[in-house]
Amino acid sequence: MASSYSSDLKLELQATGENASTWGDKTNNNLNLLQQAIAGYQSIDVASADVTLAMTDASVSNARNMILKFTGTLAGNRQVLVPNSIEKFYIVQDATTHNSNTLTFKTVSGSGFTLDQGTISAAFSDGTNITAVNLNTLSGTIGTAQIDDNAITTAKILDNNVTTAKIPNDAITTAK
């Protein structure tokens, strides 16, 4: 039975007993591909044309990188297209100059989102669409900050660093 390839990262899945003298090389290649998926970075110029990322079996591919930085001055509306059926998490940086144009990060056949110039976004592909991970989509609460008794001393506050303009009325109380 011949090797097959994983659906998302295209890692080689060796059949039992296959590659008797080369399994180490193939395993090392898979580990390098995992490293690319977890920590890979690539800068991609998107100024003059749409870019379709590739994910090929058992070889370094730009769609496998965790972090993608988009650069260039957009000459028109641009799209960065992730292959369909890839399920993966991305961090994308829009380091382009838009000049009234847009930059969209999406799958080839599905939907995605428009990047804002100068921002870094987290996003995931579910194999059909790409969704931005925004702070307003996360849940949980942030507790109220408290300062312990005797935590602030004169030695810790430089002269003129605390002014009434920096402290709203009634912001400091003895109640905890």
Please provide the spans of the model-predicted regions.
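Register-specific beta-strand positions within repetitive beta-rich fiber domains
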Residues: 47-49, 135-176
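Short, surface-exposed terminal/edge motifs of secreted or surface/virion proteins that either
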Residues: 31-41, 99-107, 122-136, 164-166
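Exposed extracellular interaction/assembly regions and N-terminal maturation sites
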Residues: 2-102, 148-153, 171
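Residues on the solvent-exposed faces and adjacent turns
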Residues: 70-72, 94, 107, 117, ...
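Extracellular disulfide-bonded cysteine-rich modules/repeats
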Residues: 22-29, 116-126, 153, 163-164, ...
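Extracellular/luminal recognition modules and glycoprotein regions
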Residues: 61, 113-114
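A short, sequence-level motif marking secondary-structure junctions
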Residues: 84-85, 117-121, 138
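Ser/Thr/Gly-rich low-complexity blocks that favor extended beta-strand/coil architectures
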Residues: 86, 99, 107-113
